Amino acid sequence: MKKILIRTATGLVYIALILIATLCGPYAFLSIFSIIAALGIAEMLKLCTKDEKPSVATTVIDILGGMAFFILSFSHYFPDFSVINPLWAGIGYILLRGIMQLYDKRRNAIRQLSASYMAMFLVVFPLSLLSKLYLEANGHTTLLACLIFIWMNDTGAFCVGSLIGRHRLFERISPKKSWEGFWGGLFFTIVAAVIIGTYFPAYFSEFDVIRWVGLAIVVSAFSTWGDLAESMVKRTAGVKDSGHLLPGHGGILDRIDSLLFVVPAVLIYINFVI
């Protein structure tokens, strides 16, 4: 019972922070998600270099470089940041990180560089794409809908999978996930999309019901793939959770793994499908 209460309290605090970031303006969004990016980088580095810790210097560069790239991705909204193009900042980071590795004689260069670049590619880059979604007209409501869909997908997958899950979805990577759970998550997500499009069109005014349902299907599928991708990394590292930051939930990557795959997929859906 105590574990359930801790897990519930942690989940509510996390959801509250994400809602504050999404609904309380760009400065709140930038501040909260910058911290999330930094924590995600640190966890990914730890997962990918489990047997060989990176140096403090390279870890600091990875975290600062990732936060800088994320913040600069909002440069078109914040004129003070527009003097530096995030593309050039990213190129500068890649060069600096590679040069730093030349002077680290004690560690495996391939493993260390792979961990750093993987953290940038799998954590920072998808989070940076949030700027493309959030800063569009009414983009914050689209992002809010995506978050609702992710949470409903997780809830549906857990409830249905726990009750009637029999057929393994991807046993090699995540033995507990089932096809029944997947379809349950998809059903919950589609129901949420229908409710949003039917009963809250004044607030969620970007799309009609059909397009919201299409978005829900995209979110459900890529949310599952994102979860599986992080499970693959954790299984390779031989750990159950990405960290211990969130009591009852694991690490920050355990909470945002779905979002990291959903954001790029949603942008493709919005820009090229509808």
Identify what each model region corresponds to.
Residues R235-S258:
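Interfacial loop-to-transmembrane junctions
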Residues T189-I190, R255, V262, N271:
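Hydrophobic transmembrane alpha-helices of multi-pass small-molecule transporters
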Residues M152-S162, S223-R235:
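Short helical (or helix-break) motifs at transmembrane helix termini and adjacent helical loops
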Residues L267-I274:
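Juxtamembrane boundary at the C-terminal end of a transmembrane helix
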Residues M1-V218:
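Membrane-embedded alpha-helical bundles of polytopic integral membrane proteins
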Residues S162-L163, V233-G238, L260, A265:
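Re-entrant/interfacial helical elements at transmembrane boundaries that shape
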Residues E43, D154, D227, D254-D257:
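Acidic active-site catalytic centers that drive phospho-/nucleotidyl reactions
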